[in-house]
Amino acid sequence: IYDGQKMSIYKERNYDSTKQWKLSDSDLWFKADETAGYNKLEGNPGVYQYDGTKLSYLTFPVKTKLGQENHYSISTNFVRSKNGAVWFGTYGALIGYNGSDFTIINDSYLGLNDETGHLHIRSIMEDSKGNLWIGNNGIGVLKYDGEKVINFTEQQKLKKEDTKGNSLERVFSIGEDRLGNVWFGTVESGVWRYDGNSMKNFTKKDGLESKHIWKIYKSKKGALWFGGASPSGVYQFNGNSFERKY
């Protein structure tokens, strides 16, 4: 960890229980290096927290089942919401902590099963209105307003069975531009833009050559950058179409 003057390397971990979770504005959060890490205790799903003094490994208040060892492995960036809570996206659940309580949105919470499809979270983003967007590889996009969760993909009728073409089912990146439009990067279905009323799909004909959009990054000036693969490329939207920058 670099504090602006020197680099500190932490080889030993402090393993705190879930009862010792705490939250402050200056916390740094890190994904575990492996499912099992350097110590058997790291086999319990959780995250590293640096509080300015020490690095600790904090376990999530969840129970893993045999064969689901990676179910609660971190799969997204961390999101610090406007109300102060921190959100962790794992493959099988969205876990939020507000300093005292946990919110766990998983298959059981949503009533999902083999027939409906399961959570497979690949991206999370909080928009300027405080809505949390959850991108999945399979069941599409979920939207959480702090009280209820809706399947946004189903609401917009953007499942493959509805569109017979490009869908909003495999979403790996989400971003919001300075105008409040929400953008979704997909696998093999280009980029979708939601302006609050309708959806628009951008593909190769719009200058987007990459089939997979893995990352949407927002600069300090509010510009969105889109990182893709197959083929690799970095793009920006000029208001009408995408321009490849790299």
Walk through the language-model features, giving the residues of each.
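Carboxylate-rich, polar loop motifs that coordinate divalent cations or form catalytic acidic clusters
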Residues: 1-246
